[in-house]
Amino acid sequence: MNVEAVQQYQHRTVLLEEAVDALALDGERANGMYVDGTFGRGGHSRLILQRLGENGCLLAFDKDTQAIANAATIEDKRFAIVHDSFATLSTALAERGIAQVNGVLLDLGISSPQVDDAARGFSFRADGPLDMRMDTTRGISAAEWLATETEQKIEKVIREYGEERFAFQIAKAIVAGRAVQPISSTRQLAEIVARAVKTREKGKDPATRTFQAIRIFINQELEELEVVLNEAYRHLAPHGRLVVISFHSLEDRIVKQFMASKANVPQPDRRLPIRAVDLPQPEMKLIARIKPSAAEISANPRARSAVMRVAERLPTPGAAS
């Protein structure tokens, strides 16, 4: 992979300082073990490395071969990257003999270079092959999936992952369109969707929700998010931080519900004769919910929908922290 080609697509890391600040890399924690589950173009990872102590370590993940090529430019013995999904966190840690980490950062969604590179097939704004895979070395492309999937399944994906109210009409149009000719380009799909959607949302292309839905499905984004949240929690040391940046409501809902399930423990009836020490205890503490500043949104409009949630693992009652 040509690194110069990687760098031609500019990317601004969203909530850069805020996310790394949330990991609390100070004092003894600076020499801890950290995970960047989504290396991307390395904005968060590079800032984490700047703040890590001499004995600190950072393990990053990414499915995108361009991201892996970019990571190869980092010459730092404290850094390693895995070319795989962050959902393989437990396996990667076990292979390295690591039981606990002090912080996990997940910057979800799709990066600007992926969107802006027409050859990746993520965007309807420029014509390109209908691919949409984060990892182009494995799995099936969006074009391959649309060529064979049932109308009912296509509708379900667009409705659930795109929250698209015209999912029925769009799926029907896709199946009718592929009967005439294979749907192999982003422009073809965008035009089919535009013809099927009779009304318009102000400031939003009619293909936006459909492209989001198919991308999420092809890359199993929500399923992998649920896996990594549980794996991250399991490996967090006491007072370890989980920092997650989401870019749409489906992701944020999963993150919010997961953190709430660990922080808000149902309590039994107070009238029952249960000792305080035997009451269910919260496993995490909610630290923050942060949105980008007006200044950041002005400089980078793609940050507008970002939401960052931070939670900290609590020590087990009675255990040394």
Swiss-Prot record:
Task: Tell me its EC number(s), please.
Answer: 2.1.1.199
Q: What cellular-component terms does GO give this entry?
A: cytoplasm
Which reaction is recorded as catalysed by this protein?
cytidine(1402) in 16S rRNA + S-adenosyl-L-methionine = N(4)-methylcytidine(1402) in 16S rRNA + S-adenosyl-L-homocysteine + H(+)
One of the entry's Gene Ontology molecular-function terms is: rRNA (cytosine-N4-)-methyltransferase activity
NCBIfam families in the record: 16S rRNA (cytosine(1402)-N(4))-methyltransferase RsmH
Please describe what this protein does.
Specifically methylates the N4 position of cytidine in position 1402 (C1402) of 16S rRNA.
Q: What is this protein called?
A: Ribosomal RNA small subunit methyltransferase H
This chain's source organism reads Herminiimonas arsenicoxydans
